[in-house]
């Protein structure tokens, strides 16, 4: 998948991959429809950082989820 192109499909892909990697329990809390392409670059930065790591501390998980929350559509 070419994530260099802004698209709703790429947003959906990154969100689904983040949910799997972070083992999000409440799957409805993070949906692709909650995110706008306006924040694509920021979302991609989070995606790339998360995909490079194997594990996360609880505080890192909380920080990532909070950052994703700040990118949600208002």
Curated annotation (Swiss-Prot):
It comes from the Bacteria. InterPro entries: UPF0435. It holds the Pfam family DUF1128. Belongs to the UPF0435 family. This is UPF0435 protein GK0418. It comes from Geobacillus kaustophilus (strain HTA426).
């Amino acid at each position: 998948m070419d994530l260099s192109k802004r698209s709703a499909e790429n947003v959906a892909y990154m969100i689904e991959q983040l949910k799997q990697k972070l083992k999000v329990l409440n799957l409805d809390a993070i949906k692709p429809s909650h995110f706008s392409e306006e924040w694509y670059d920021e979302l991609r930065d989070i995606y790339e950082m998360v995909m490079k790591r194997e594990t996360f501390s609880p505080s890192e998980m909380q920080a990532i989820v909070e950052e994703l929350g700040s990118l949600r559509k208002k």
